């Protein structure tokens, strides 16, 4: 399926708090930039990279002791919590499509 043919019905799970750090290396970029919070976002897919309307986000705090590896694990845990919640809300029509 092509994104341009999806009529706004495709969601994406992204490993940053969009609009910050779009693209494939969101966790690494947040870590290298030195921000104190990051997280994950679920958004509607549009032709523009990671620019669709945001459905929901989950915050992850970056501790002084975090390594890139530990931060990656924390963001993945947040993603695994957020995605089923959003899918459930979509299935119950609690979230409208764009």
Which residues does each predicted region cover?
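Donor/substrate-binding cores of folate-linked one-carbon enzymes
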Residues: 4-98
């Amino acid at each position: 399926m092509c994104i341009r043919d999806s009529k706004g019905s495709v969601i994406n799970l992204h490993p940053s708090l969009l609009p910050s750090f779009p693209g494939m290396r969101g966790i690494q970029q947040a870590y290298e930039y030195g921000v104190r919070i990051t997280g994950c976002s679920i958004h509607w897919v549009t032709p523009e990279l990671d620019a669709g309307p945001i459905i929901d986000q989950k915050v992850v705090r970056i501790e002084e002791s975090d390594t890139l590896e530990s931060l990656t694990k924390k963001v993945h845990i947040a993603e695994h919590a957020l995605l089923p919640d959003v899918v459930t809300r979509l299935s119950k029509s609690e979230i409208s499509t764009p």
